[in-house]
Amino acid sequence: MRNNIKENILELIQTLYEAHSNAEALIKEKDNQSVCALLEDCQNAAIHIGESIEQSEGENFITVKYLEAYCELLYTTSVNISNGIYEKIKENLNAQLHVIEDSVRDDIKGKWEIVFLPYKVSMWDSLESIWKRAFEDDDFDTYVVPIPYYDRNPDRTFGEYHYEGKLFPADVPITHYEDYNFAERMPDAIFIHNPYDLGNLVTSVEPKFYSNILKNYTNLLIYIPYFLFPKEPQTHLIDTFALENVDSIFVQMKK
């Protein structure tokens, strides 16, 4: 399961704890109708959590079983409330929810989704070693998404279109840039090696892949230069458009 989905589930579980407290307050006000409606909302939330877990872990996963038991408890609780039985409602619901929370934390393995955005295959070696380590690690789902670029005309308009996705080594699984939906997937990290955005006078990547746009789709935008840095910092090497938007820079220094 993606780490961000796992975190969303844990956040939703916290809202269920709050709902249990709200239900207890409504019981004290003898508002049984509102209590039962709130418990139904809890059941719908639990079903949503279960569906998310089933998609990644399978329908027989242990956490799903705990959620099913929670839904049964919610139903029984609603029936009891309708019959005027209010004993240990919050305590019982919280106990079962705690079992679910522990299972989400301990039984569901979170995975990081990382996207690499090379544009020229000749510069792939700057990203390749990091990609390879992540690709071979079960904690990561990796996507190599080569992005198109254009030559610049003398007037700085876009000239010839280039896409080099078919030129990469055969052992590198390639995802076409039109097949990866950044807004839906929201990767945990994006790696780029072109920091210039609209500032390059010779070429330009497709504008929708400029760093200020990519930043909207991840919490960690990382720039890896495709050259070795000199021992003494050079201003022209670090003063580029993308550096206003990236979260980290990985560099290799000349010895």
Regions from the PLM with identified roles:
Residues 112-255:
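Active-site and donor-binding regions of nucleotide-sugar-utilizing enzymes
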